[in-house]
UniProtKB/Swiss-Prot annotation:
Keywords: Coiled coil, Cytoplasm, Nucleus, Repeat, WD repeat. Residues 834-844 have a biased composition (Basic and acidic residues). The keyword Disulfide bond does not apply. This is Enhancer of mRNA-decapping protein 4. The lineage of its organism: Eukaryota, Metazoa, Chordata, Craniata, Vertebrata. It is found in: Cytoplasm, P-body; Nucleus. The keyword Transmembrane helix does not apply. It comes from Danio rerio.
Length: 1384
């Protein structure tokens, strides 16, 4: 208790808060778990996999190698925390939900990740929304991003990454919806705007300036609606060694519109057009349009050869289209399916490695699809069309209303998927692992990197392996070595990591972002996770599987149940579907991309060749799969071995014993899906002969023979004529050995040949060797050599001729081909029917034998005729089936095979020596002539020479095989030792890491317990200590203080009394002196004045405001009231006096005015009478003068006036008649055309009266009546008068239009009758009148077509007569407008 009371409470409290990190969010998964168990008020957040309690988190090791845990886990939930604990979180399940961290929300104050390095490039404000296209395009040389100018016009800014030079691209309609470079090394920049206009620029740098050249510009019609969802997709660039210009390969791209997709060939466009822009409506070739989706097309992808387009739409479908740009064929839908059960799709990514393209790896093997703005991602296998993995993103519990809006992008190596959330300031990096051989791909880890702002769009420039400290980019060869070293050493000794370089568009700026982190170092167990519906016997691979030395490792160290050494006990798993084997009928029908090309005379390059091709994803129909099951599985020896080896490799456990040396493996019978076929397989070590995947291993025979059936709906690969099979009698018997030294020698010679060794890198070896049924160790030590076996069996004779026939009853064995020289020699010597039975018997005990196959009854060609060309170059040591088989003059039946005609003539003669050489010699001498004997001697000599050559070849071959086997064994032992040492070191490091992690977890647990103990003690002691201190202080402190202060108080009182007495006397004396002093008096007076000045002023002010002002205000108010009353009274009195005065004044004026008026009236009368008299006098005199002058003038001008008047009257009358005739005709036509809508007045007014009436109506605002009256008069001048009087904007600027539809139609018709005069006024009114026509009005619908057609004809005549008029442009535009309305 004493120690607790002596604690510094405030310091302990702050220390405890610092330990528990109560002032900031926790960043430890274990602390979060402990705090969530103890108190929910702590701020720690859960990181990693949910569902484990406190003790589980402390005691269970979170290793990714625990296959038992993985085997039972189908779903997984990952809660990200926003700190370094959210980097490389392992993914272990097929269905994974990733929950965003709280710190990633926009309103969070958390800082960005320290793994992210940001450098600003440009400052610009982009609108915060989800952009379906790209705002930025990145290449190794240039950077382009879309912006808006001051007048809201879209532009593209181009930056040179090395020289920081800038350029601006303009000329867009609406906003830029998508832009992209053809590839990273390309200078071709493609762009599409909201109107669908396509731009392709060629960017070059000259004298530190960026030069942009438009090489393609496709322009859409002006009435094209704007759409912000248009996309631009380039055809992927596949670099080739012989490519001189990479830009020539990138000449195909796709445009995605709302309702269609277009594929454009830039070569055809550039060859057919030399000037740009070009209207899309004028193009007839160079592109193809694809329609077929019910909703908006959101994503697309072109195959590398440009023959297949994959589209994803909001209707939920992904469709594959076969396209023919140059031909007349329409695009064909090859396959369609809904990957997300009808949800709108937003992502379509094919996992192809374009950074390091392997010609043996097929394209489009795996596919990533996304729905609902990539809230859900799925990994698909395009061979079996099965979903391999599902990833779902969900918001954190504090922001459930803000759903993720993700944009996804794969790097060129297809190893990392990068995602940005528009609604959160975060970047996700997901690691992707692919296994082409096993047909599996999955995401293995996810990393979260916090940013300062949300990313609206980004472009990945490079993903490479870099040094940890110096961020030095490793070269490709060191990168692969580093990857291997990291896989063996683990995360604790990793020296390198992944560096991602990308450019991000934020809401406030464009930034250069670099991310460095160490990838997931766990095993690849997530790649082999069981799917729903998989077989029960499926087991996960051990971590030793990656070393390829499982045959030499101990099975006792693993925790797997069951023996994995016995290959016959391994449950067979279904191999991935391929066109080499029939697929189930339930799979959708889809042709291979190779089959989409036009059939040619030769087969295209297969995936096993040097050329790259697409993954074969075609499924066969149910009828063909059943009917052709046996044929497809028994096409050729090479094909059959590939198929069975592929399925066997997928089914077998990686810990099974691998045979180190070819030819020494066990004979294992594996039943394919279609019985009764079985094969004797031998396991080949992957380190000696690399295994090929089912999709890429193709024998040359299949490639050379399958060239004619690729254009069918169900592609059928042509096979060799060789068929394989075994009879049902020996289906359950042990492996049957057919030793053939010649076949074995030829096979081994083929293995050792340079062509065979080089071709082994890309496909399975055509070598097919049997194996003896002995143990591996006995095989290595007790196997006789080839020559020893041959020599020991040489004298066996015909006694062993029935060994093979006793247990085997099948067709003639297919022997390897021999050289042309040996074949010709044997043919010339007539040994086409020689027997090989004795040679077989002579090598019956050899472990090297050739696997046998059936020749069907319909075979009529040589089994070796379809061998590839490199087989003919091998100098075989055995007879070919072409000399002894169907090419012979006869074919032996099966029952005669016991005495095989293929045996050597020399062996026949040796077998007949015992029957008596003397009788045979005598018979020969008696029956044959000397000439026949010479021929036989020559034949014997030639055969002896051949046998000697064969023996010498066998000796050479034995030496080569022995040296090769020694080298192989030494290399195998070195590999095994190295692998075992590496595995031992890895296990040791793993144990050390486990111990360190256990100690760290224990230490963390102890720290947590100490923290909680301190907190508990603090909480309990603080309350109790405070209560105790208060009670003790209340009881003891006041009493103690009073007791100690009593004597002090008495002493102080006496001392103070004495002091006060002395001070009082001195004070009185001094005060008296001071008061009597003049200075003091003055000072006091000044001080009093200064002191009293302020209070007096305030008192006066307050008194004035509170007393004087109210009294004065009341006095003024009463005074003003009295003044007002007096003024009113005086005013009334004045008014009365004024009225009386005015009345008196008026009366006096009236009295004086009457006599004056009478006098004026008299004067006016007199003046009028005098004026009348004067007027009559003047008129008479003037009229007489005027008449006299007129008579004189008329006499002189009468003739000239008559002549002029006649001419003028005649011209005016004729012109008036013509105008009247035209007006009458026009009125009649107008009355006939607009009889239904145009009223005709009963009586015509004259022109002036009509003008006055119309003007009056216009002044009154009755526009419709004014125009109707003018149009009813059938006078164009009157109509023009109305148009001139009132402006067109005053008429048509009102809404709705004051003119009726009938008046509008009549106005359009009359104004268009003559466009040669007053053209500007007429066209102006015509434009406005046409724009105000109501298409829904029945009168307009009935008469609009005829009226507008007439107007178009008048406009056409006007343009023909005066094409260069200033009004021709407006007239042409009006005619285009009328054309659209007429067609509408």
């Amino acid at each position: 208790m004493a120690s607790s009371s002596s604690m510094d409470i405030e310091g302990a409290t702050q220390h405890l808060r610092d330990i528990l990190k109560l002032d900031r969010p926790g960043n430890s998964a274990e602390a979060s778990l402990v705090e969530s168990q103890r108190k929910p008020s702590f701020n720690g957040e859960l990181n990693g996999v949910l569902g484990s309690d406190l003790m589980g988190a402390a005691m269970v090791e979170p290793t990714v190698h625990n296959s038992d845990k993985l085997n039972g886990q189908d779903t997984q939930t990952i809660c990200l925390s926003g700190d370094d604990g959210s980097i490389c979180v392992p993914i272990r399940a097929n269905i994974v939900e990733i929950v965003s961290s709280r710190d990633s929300s926009i309103d969070s104050k958390a800082r960005g990740s320290n793994k992210v390095k940001i450098q600003p490039v440009a400052k610009y404000d982009w609108e915060h929304k989800y952009y379906y296209g790209n705002l930025i395009a990145v290449s190794n040389t240039y950077l382009a991003y879309a912006i808006r100018g001051a007048n809201n016009h879209s532009m593209i800014r181009v930056l040179h990454l090395s020289s920081t030079e800038r350029s601006l691209l303009k000329g867009f309609t609406g906003a830029v919806t998508d832009l992209a470079f053809a590839h990273l090394d390309s200078t071709l920049l493609g762009c599409v705007d909201e109107a669908g206009n396509m731009f392709i620029w060629q960017l070059t740098s000259h004298s530190s300036k960026i030069q942009d050249e438009v090489i393609v510009h496709i322009r859409r019609p002006e009435d094209t609606p704007l759409n912000s969802n248009r996309r631009l997709i380039w055809c992927p660039f596949i670099p080739e060694d012989n490519d001189e210009s990479p830009e020539d390969a990138c000449q195909t791209l796709a445009l995605l519109h709302e309702d269609r997709a277009e594929v454009w060939d830039l070569d055809i466009l550039r060859s057919n057009n030399s000037s740009w822009p070009v209207d899309a409506t004028e193009l007839k070739e160079g592109f193809i349009t694809i329609r077929g989706h019910a909703a908006r097309i959101s994503e697309g992808a072109l195959s590398p050869d440009g023959t297949v387009l994959a589209t994803a739409s909001h209707d939920g479908y992904v469709k594959f289209w076969q396209i023919y740009i140059e031909g007349q064929d329409q695009p064909r839908c090859l396959h369609e399916w809904q990957p997300h059960n009808g949800q709108p799709l937003s992502c379509l990514l094919f996992c192809d490695n374009h950074k390091k393209q392997d010609p043996d790896v097929p394209f489009w093997r795996f596919l990533i699809t996304g729905a609902d703005q990539n809230q859900e991602l799925k990994m698909w296998c395009t061979v079996s069309w099965t979903c391999l993995q599902t990833i779902r993103f969900s918001p954190d519990p504090f922001n459930c209303g803000v759903l993720p809006s993700l944009k996804a992008s794969l790097d060129l190596s297809a190893e990392f998927l990068i995602l940005s959330d528009v609604q959160r300031k975060v970047l996700y990096v997901m690691e992707l692992l692919q296994d082409q051989e096993k047909g599996r791909a999955s995401f293995t880890a996810v990393s979260e990197f916090l940013l300062t702002h949300p990313v609206l769009s980004f472009g990945v420039q490079d993903v490479s392996r870099a040094r940890l400290r110096h961020t030095e980019v490793l070269p490709p060869e060191e990168e692969s070595e580093s990857m291997t070293a990291e896989g063996n050493q683990g995360t604790s000794e990793s020296r390198s990591g992944i560096q991602i370089k990308l450019y991000c568009v934020h809401t406030k700026s464009l930034q250069d972002v670099q991310i460095w982190f160490q990838p997931n170092q766990g095993d690849s167990s997530s790649l082999f996770m069981p799917q729903s519906g998989s077989q029960d016997g499926f087991s996960f691979s051990d971590p030793l599987a990656d070393l390829n030395v499982e045959a030499m490792s101990s099975d006792k160290e693993s925790g797997d149940s069951g023996s994995q050494n016995d290959l016959s006990k391994i449950l067979p798993l279904p191999s991935p579907a391929d066109f080499m084997s029939p697929a189930p009928s339930a799979l959708p029908k889809l042709m291979t991309p190779d089959a989409f090309m036009t059939p040619s005379a030769s087969m295209p390059a297969s995936p096993g060749s040097s050329a790259s091709s697409l993954t074969i994803v075609t499924a066969m129909s149910s009828s063909d799969s059943g009917a052709r099951g046996g044929d497809d599985l028994t096409q050729s020896p090479k094909m059959s071995v590939e198929c069975v080896n592929s399925s066997f490799a997928n089914a077998g456990s990686p810990r099974s014993n691998s045979i180190l040396i070819s030819g020494l493996g066990e004979n294992i019978q594996v039943s394919p899906p279609n019985p009764p076929l079985s094969l004797d397989l031998q396991a080949i070590d992957p380190m000696v002969v690399p295994q090929a995947s089912p999709t890429r291993a193709r024998s040359p025979d299949v490639i050379s023979s399958a060239s004619t059936a690729m254009s069918q709906d169900i592609p059928e690969i042509a096979s060799e004529t060789l068929q394989r099979g075994l009879s049902g009698a020996n289906a359950d018997s042990g492996p049957i050995l057919h030793s053939d030294s010649m076949a074995s020698a030829a096979s081994i010679l083929h293995l050792l040949s340079p062509r065979a060794r080089s071709s082994a890198e890309h496909s399975l070896l055509p070598l097919e060797l049997g194996a003896a049924s002995v143990d591996g160790e006995q095989r290595l030590s007790n196997t006789p050599s080839l020559l020893e076996t041959a020599l020991s069996q040489e004298n066996a004779g015909a006694a062993g001729g029935s060994c093979s026939d006793s247990s085997v009853n099948h067709a003639w064995p297919a022997a390897p081909d021999i050289t042309r020289e040996t074949r010709n020699s044997l043919r010339d010597n007539g040994l086409g029917d020689c027997s090989r039975e004795e040679i077989k018997d002579r090598h019956i005990s050899s472990p090297y034998h050739r696997r046998t196959y059936h020749l069907t009854q319909n075979d009529s060609q040589d089994a070796s005729a379809e061998q590839s060309d490199h087989d003919d170059e091998v100098a075989s040591l055995a007879s070919s089936s072409g000399n002894c088989g169907p090419r012979s003059s006869h074919r032996l039946p099966v029952k005669d095979w016991k005495t095989s005609p293929r045996s050597s003539p020399k062996l026949k003669r040796k077998s007949k020596k015992d029957e008596g050489e003397s009788s045979q010699s005598r018979q020969i001498e008696s029956q044959m002539s000397t000439e026949v004997q010479d021929e036989l001697l020559q034949m014997l000599r030639s055969q002896q020479r051949e046998i000697a050559e064969l023996r010498q070849n066998q000796l050479d071959l034995l030496q080569r095989v022995t040296s090769h086997m020694d080298a192989v064994q030494s290399s195998m032992m070195a590999h095994i030792e190295h692998a075992m040492l590496a595995q031992q070191e890895q296990e040791q490091r793993r144990m050390e890491r486990i111990l360190v992690e256990g100690q760290s977890r224990n230490q963390q647990l102890q720290d947590q317990l100490v923290q909680q103990l301190v907190q508990t003690l603090n909480n309990s002691l603080c309350n109790r200590l405070e209560k105790v201190l208060r009670e003790e202080m209340k009881k003891t402190v006041p009493q103690t203080i009073s007791k100690s202060l009593e004597p002090v108080t008495g002493q102080m009182n006496s001392t103070i009394a004495a002091k006060l007495t002395a001070v009082e006397g001195a004070l009185k004396e001094n005060v008296t002196k001071v008061v009597k002093s003049k200075n003091t008096t003055d000072a006091i007076g000044r001080a009093a004045a200064e002191a009293m000045q302020g209070p007096i002023q305030a008192a006066y002010k307050e008194t004035f405001q509170s007393i004087v002002l109210p009294v004065f205000e009341r006095g003024c108010q009463s005074m003003f009231q009295q003044i007002n009353d007096s003024f009113k009274q005086g005013t009334n009195e004045y008014i009365q006096q004024l009225e009386t005065h005015i009345k008196n004044r008026k009366q006096r004026d009236q009295d004086t005015r009457d006599p004056v008026i009478g006098q004026l009236q008299q004067m006016i009368d007199s003046l009028q009478s005098s004026q009348d008299q004067l007027a009559s006098t003047v008129t008479a005199s003037v009229s007489s003068d005027v008449q006299h002058q007129l008579h004189m003038i008329v006499g002189n001008l009468q003739d000239s006036i008559l002549t002029q008047v006649q001419r003028i009257v005649k011209g005016e009358v004729s012109l008036a008649m013509k105008e009247q005739q035209a007006a009458v005709t026009s009125s009649i036509m107008q009355a006939m055309r607009s009889a239904a809508g145009t009223p005709v007045p009963s009586a015509h007014l004259d022109y002036q009266a009509q003008q006055a009436s119309i003007l009056q109506l216009l002044q009154q605002g009755q526009l419709n009546e004014a125009f109707q009256q003018a149009l009813s008069a059938a006078d164009l001048n009157l109509v023009l008068y109305v148009c001139e009087t009132i402006d067109s904007q005053q008429v048509f600027g009102q809404q709705p239009c004051p003119l009726h539809q009938a008046v509008l139609l009549s106005l359009i018709q009359q104004l268009s009758t003559n466009l040669s005069t007053r053209t500007e006024l007429k066209i102006s009114y015509l434009e406005d009148a046409v724009m105000n026509l109501d298409h829904g009005d029945p009168v307009t619908r009935d008469h609009m077509s005829a009226v507008l057609t007439q107007v178009r004809q008048k406009l056409f005549l006007f343009l023909q007569q005066d094409a260069h008029s200033p009004m021709s442009k407006r007239a042409r535009r009006l005619m285009m407008m009328l054309q659209g309305l007429v067609n509408h």
